[in-house]
Amino acid sequence: MKTFDELWAELSEKARSRPEGSGTVRALDAGVHGIGKKLVEEAAESWMAAEHEGPERAAEEISQLLYHAQVLMLATGIDLDDVYAHL
């Protein structure tokens, strides 16, 4: 299990080092539009899982939503402090 901050550190390192075969690198290469489409997809899947599939599936989908939100943050140059300033 990892925290939101630990995920951020991991994804930031992948964005910096760009390891071959990385799904994060592929997502970043898709650009803001591609990442945004994936974020919307994961939001819908989170909602559907919460409404129809139960807490375990909802948690899984929400984890994917958070992952793609962080990838979008990396693609746009937003860091955790930028987001935390609005919480």
Swiss-Prot record:
Q: Which Gene3D superfamilies match?
A: MazG-like (1.10.287.1080)
Task: Give the record's keywords alphabetically.
Answer: Amino-acid biosynthesis, ATP-binding, Cytoplasm, Histidine biosynthesis, Hydrolase, Nucleotide-binding
What is the protein's major site of localization? cytoplasm
Show the catalytic activity: 1-(5-phospho-beta-D-ribosyl)-ATP + H2O = 1-(5-phospho-beta-D-ribosyl)-5'-AMP + diphosphate + H(+)
* UniProt-listed Pfam families: PRA-PH (PF01503)
GO MF term (any one): phosphoribosyl-ATP diphosphatase activity
Q: Which cysteines are joined by disulfide bonds?
A: none
Does the UniProt entry include the keyword Lipid biosynthesis?
A: no
Q: Which GO terms describe its cellular component?
A: cytoplasm
Which SUPFAM superfamilies does this one have? Answer: all-alpha NTP pyrophosphatases
GO terms, biological process: L-histidine biosynthetic process
- Per the UniProt entry, the Enzyme Commission number(s) are 3.6.1.31
What CDD domains would the database entry show?
NTP-PPase_HisE (cd11547)
HAMAP family in UniProt:
HisE (MF_01020)
Family, according to the entry, reads as follows: Belongs to the PRA-PH family.
Q: What is this protein called?
A: Phosphoribosyl-ATP pyrophosphatase
Q: Which organism is it from?
A: Nocardioides sp. (strain ATCC BAA-499 / JS614)
Gene this chain is encoded by: hisE
